[in-house]
Amino acid sequence: MEGHPDCDLKENWKYYLEEAQQEPEVQAKLSEIRKEYAALNPEDIKLIDPCMGSGHILVYAFDVLMQIYESAGYSQRDAAKSILEHNIYGLDIDDRAYQLAYFAVMMKARQYNRRILNGENTCHVYAIQESNSINRAHLKYFGAGMDDIEKNAAKMQLEGLLDTLTDAKEYGSILNVESYNWDLLRRFVAAEDTAGQISMDSAVSYTHLTLPTKA
């Protein structure tokens, strides 16, 4: 609403609070922020629930985002697909909660796009996975074809990520994951030594490590 104050969307938002009167210097700063927000596209909005449970907040956010997309001229069908791909993200330590949230979000998407389940769609809700079961000795088999500098950098970063995700289900949303070179890590994991018959799936006993997809 900061970027589009004349929009009538807030009439449908029960808990929306009007902005209070501000000091002149604060008001000037807010005006600058509104100019930046006015250039935002609906796809630029990001919302994450780091302890999503069954996905209730994400489902509510889906409806709000749908109103924003429609006000920008999108059809419900296109908006539903875009919301899944660009706008909402969720995490939880419980695998069962993840399953419920995934189902809830996809059913909400289907409410607006009946064909959403027929194609390949990215739903950015995940269960946090621990790195405890990953055999780090197998990391030496990855990075085939990469030069030594890139390979060593990727291995160092991946080991740092594995350290962070040790006992991750105990820490959940308080985890602080550093900013890594995800493109480098994806290439490192994908470039496996086929002669060694090792893949990231075989390096872990329960589940494979999923690196973030490109937004």
Which role fits each region the language model picked out?
Residues 1-211, 215:
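SAM-dependent methyltransferase catalytic region
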